[in-house]
Amino acid sequence: MGKEKIHINIVVIGHVDSGKSTSTGHLIYKCGGIDKRTIEKFEKEAAEMGKGSFKYAWVLDKLKAERERGITIDIALWKFETSKYYVTIIDAPGHRDFIKNMITGTSQADCAVLIVAAGVGEFEAGISKNGQTREHALLAFTLGVKQLIVGVNKMDSTEPPYSQARFEEIQKEVSTYIKKIGYNPAAVAFVPISGWHGDNMLEASDKMSWFKGWKIERKDGNASGTTLLEALDAILPPSRPTDKPLRLPLQDVYKIGGIGTVPVGRVETGVLKPGMVVTFAPPNLTTEVKSVEMHHESLPEAVPGDNVGFNIKNVSVKEIRRGYVAGDSKNDPPKAAASFNAQVIILNHPGQINQGYAPVLDCHTAHIACKFNELIEKIDRRSGKKLEDNPKFVKSGDAAIVKLIPQKPMVVEPFSNYPPLGRFAVRDMRQTVAVGVIKAVDTKEISGKTTKAAEKAQKKK
């Protein structure tokens, strides 16, 4: 069998009509998990509806619709393989909660693929001041997605088709604006593609003989190639944070007859093993882990990325809930936050945000109202430089450092220590009004309970 391929996550971003669905659909279609029968079924439906020309996007639309109806269709459909990696597409904008998902996202993307349309007038629309392209790219960078690939799509609809001049014009302009955001254009592969016809997707196109391939320079090693698939292969593999202390935000807590209380969640950092003594914050409740399971099989240890259930002793299902975080009681255990400072970017708020504003924050699995207790400073959203102290208010487009106070017990961490617990979405009026990255946290000591099982386990050690 040989060694299993490394799993990586990508997020696909870009303007509505850039052809994200078609390009993504093409990759999944050609290298991916969609079985032939499903494809044939979709193709037949597409043809019957006169959508023959739309087949890749149609495949993706079907998947998306099923995903949104809450039917968890075989998630393998969102995966495809390159020669080096198993790639999972964790989300594609256009989903209603894209921004929220990207932030509280169950997984951090290792790389963003930005699709821009090269068609006449299309590129300009996507990148204009109010186009989504900038917003998505800024969001990806702010949330720590440091690798980027740019697919210049719809090369078949430039004037003349497959125009070298148009590709170079777009490459130049996109380079300028991703540089402003913080990406280094020299480390970004720019690939001229047609997601529809398949040019430079998996195989080099014979229509763009002028394209001598993409090159990237970075301190972790240079790379070059021709196709989008090769660019995905050149992504630097993520280092999964097993060496950090354990952080496991709870998604659910079950009571299982004959077993007892079983919290479920995804290991974000560190490892979880049977026999470990864990502390749940905010209530500061300490107990022993009896067993750890994934897909109904017991595990000797769970590592970052694993979605697990674990059985704990002497704790009732009423004492812990979704949004709580488990950690190793002997190694920097999580604590309740009294307040925290964060850098926020206001995305779409119809009015002004003043001191005292108390929207709901979505951070990891927690969903808790937090008060903007102090607007500390307004900053330039690209450079981070201070613009003014103690602004009276902030509005859409602004970035600021603010002090937030959770209105109920909550666990958050500085982004620099534990990224998945250090980014959040601010939700109000049924939309994401702001995103934030946590800079510093003031914790509070809560005297919690330690179960008998934990005391016994600690004595044994």
Curated annotation (Swiss-Prot):
Chief location category: cytoplasm
Modified residues (5-glutamyl glycerylphosphorylethanolamine): 301, 374
GO biological process: translation; translational elongation
Sequence segments annotated as region (G2): 70-74
Keywords: Cytoplasm, Elongation factor, GTP-binding, Hydrolase, Methylation, Nucleotide-binding, Phosphoprotein, Protein biosynthesis
Highest taxon of the lineage: Eukaryota
Stretch list, region G3: 91-94
Location(s) in or outside the cell: Cytoplasm
Gene Ontology CC entries for this record: cytoplasm
Record region (G1): 14-21
Modified residues (N,N,N-trimethylglycine): 2
E.C. code: 3.6.5.-
Single GO molecular function: GTPase activity
Residue stretches making up the tr-type G domain: 5-242
Binding sites annotated in the UniProt record for GTP: 14-21, 153-156, 194-196
Annotated region described as G4, given as residue ranges: 153-156
One protein family per Pfam: GTP_EFTU
Reactions performed catalytically: GTP + H2O = GDP + phosphate + H(+)
Family: Belongs to the TRAFAC class translation factor GTPase superfamily. Classic translation factor GTPase family. EF-Tu/EF-1A subfamily.
Primary role: Translation elongation factor that catalyzes the GTP-dependent binding of aminoacyl-tRNA (aa-tRNA) to the A-site of ribosomes during the elongation phase of protein synthesis. Base pairing between the mRNA codon and the aa-tRNA anticodon promotes GTP hydrolysis, releasing the aa-tRNA from EEF1A1 and allowing its accommodation into the ribosome. The growing protein chain is subsequently transferred from the P-site peptidyl tRNA to the A-site aa-tRNA, extending it by one amino acid through ribosome-catalyzed peptide bond formation.
Protein name as catalogued: Elongation factor 1-alpha
Taxonomic lineage: Eukaryota, Metazoa, Chordata, Craniata, Vertebrata
Name of encoding gene: eef1a
